[in-house]
Amino acid sequence: MLGALLLLLQATPPRPVAPAPREQPALAVLIVVDQMRPDYFTRFGPQFTGGFRRILDQGILYLDGRQDHAMTETAPGNSTLLSGRSPSSTGILSNDLGVNDPLYPIVGGGWGDAASPMRFQGTTLYDWMLAKDPATRVLSISRKDRAAILPVGRARRDVYWWTRGRWGTSRYYGDSLPAWLQRYNARPGWRRLAGAAWTPLLPDAAYAELDSVPWENRGKEFTFPHVAPSDTTALAARIVYFPWMDSLTLDAALEGTRQLGLGRRSEGPDLLVVGLSTTDRVGHDYGPDSKEMHDQLLRLDRWLAWFADSLGRLVPSDRIIWSLTSDHGIQDWVEHTVERGGAADRPTMQPMTLRLRAAMQDRWGSSFGIAQEDGLLYGDTAAMRARGVDIGRLADSLAAEARLLPGVWRVYTPRTLTRALRADAEARIWRRGIPVTQGWLVAASVRQGYVWERTDHGSTTLADQRVPIAFWGMGIPASRVSRPVSTTAIGPTLAAFLGIHPTEPVTGIVLPEVVPSGGARLPRRLPPGLHP
């Protein structure tokens, strides 16, 4: 009898033990590294020992993240990150039509362009958090105004950016800086870097790149060391050209977290967004294949580890959910591509744009706001149409001219883009990039290797679209994912992890590697401007 009972017990499978409930997140952190390419993780991974190393060892890293829209610039890119939507829906076409707003000057008369999120349409993760918990706090800070403003949409909260010598904001957010930030600005901080030299972090043997490349930095001061101005007035403007700007941004973010009490409420999580802009500056000055870029990323890797460790002393590290991405990628420099025997050039639509402006001014007494950027020729087509301009014929004529430019392989007009098949992947990229309210005439795409005018990104090429997307912390399993993933997934994925839902339709999906039961579904009917 006893033997039979023992056999029965052995044959009975043990009851599964329910997993321990995950502790509620206290803080969601988004790090945005401007112009960060995903291949930097593989190129420099063996030398990463800090924050990037933690992503490689402990996080989910999507190596084919994409800003899958046209006009791959900082403003539209940042507008996608926490909104779950493309620029066609957020209303942010480009940097030029991003956050610049003369109605909201810098607080206290500080240096910098007036700025606000008034062009931004819809909601972001912070609005969704606020809908569930009205006491939710947020801090968004960056060297660039658009990188601080757009991830959190229209929220009138703690949003700050570098205003040449101090951290500031615009009158959209208030009439004065908070006392804690005034005290922080008064510290010596960045002034101690006057006359400092940027030299390589590691011995020369650790760098495969050449140091002396004459087309870098416009042919001036293109070798190490790079010395900062000794005059603090000059340094206040020039420090953005040095890696230290990122460390200053991280330090300010840490102080803001401390002063605002982020992550220390028992009621629910808070949000911290940190935009790190120096990688973009170094990329524009020296290129993505430069020794300077290599060194910048090594330094940022170490600073991110310091930041994470310091933040973990303010907020329990096991209650922080981290994410990292970028606003856009960058192509190899034209000069490098040509040197390697590839096809490359810098086409421009500026001459045809200037001729059109002059013709409109002569004929109608107005240029109708006609401008061009990154292959898009745009303007107030509604006003043109009201004056009798045949928009269709004009667009067709301009498109024929654009097709003759070097490297151009696809050209759309409003009519042809509307009629393009869903299978036309390039058309989908342009549809996602142009806000529904934006008037335009011609959209031209260039082949890989071709860069519009004096820019280094902004096109629809994969190199400009590709960015890393990473999540780590709070038990997220480490893995690397190679399939394409849109940056519009970041906001909905963080929302699902926090246990909240978007308050409006979004096209970004919940990434199953981060939230396995998130339910990656699109709404049945998409409002105008939402393009999957």
Predicted regions and their residues:
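Second-shell loop/turn segments in exported
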Residues: 18-19, 36-43, 67-68, 111-116, ...
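Short, structured active-site-proximal loop/turn typified by the sulfatase FGly-forming signature C/S-X-P-X-R
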Residues: 42-89, 130, 135-141
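Active-site neighborhoods of enzymes that stabilize oxyanions during catalysis
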Residues: 106, 118-126, 132, 139, ...
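Short secondary-structure boundary/capping segments
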Residues: 45-48, 153-162, 286-294, 329-351
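Metal-dependent active-site segment of extracytoplasmic phospho-/sulfohydrolases and closely related
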Residues: 51, 299-341, 422-424, 444, ...
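His/Asp/Glu-rich, glycine-adjacent segments
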Residues: 86, 91-268, 277-284, 403-410, ...
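Active-site-proximal N-terminal segment of extracellular/periplasmic enzymes that hydrolyze or transfer
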Residues: 14-60
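A long, amphipathic alpha-helix that forms part
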Residues: 40-41, 239-265, 279-320, 395-397, ...
